[in-house]
């Protein structure tokens, strides 16, 4: 049909699959596919109004789902839908940034998600039962990806890309309480061609006004120097 279809998660009993239907960057739906009957039921999105809905995972009881949506705000928010009552709870309604990553532990008791704050990733831990979350405050500034829980849920693996590292692996020690964590340990040191990373320039986040007085965020990579230097402005993305 010209759109993209893919599987997001299996139910714990192995009888159902969460199916993602991506139509465009502003329109995505989700379904539950019953393996035995081969029938699918729409659970997120509508034919009448467009909204982005990225289905992520079943909860530990298979009675609800976690997903990312822009239906209720100008940001992509993390939300939870109870499949029995059809009630929806936006979990990150106090975070004015896009949620762009999510992972859940094998037992479904813990989850982690990332938020894009002006170009940098912020990591949060989520208690899937209480729906409370906590910011992890000991992660180096950069872009976070590749998140995965260990089988026992005691560790969270992730990659961090920043101004001194193209992408390196880190492991965050976790406690029994889903919101408690221990040390963050770096596991790899990527090849940078023999360059001295201490001389790499750390970007500085600034904002400047556009022609219509909108604040535009930008990163400046500039070494200390006495004379004015030429500047290259690289613009990523645009209206969609």
Model-identified regions with their sequence ranges:
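Peripheral, non-catalytic segments that deliver or gate enzyme domains
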Residues: 1-227, 238-240
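Hydrophobic beta-strand anchors of alpha/beta hydrolase catalytic cores
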Residues: 230-234
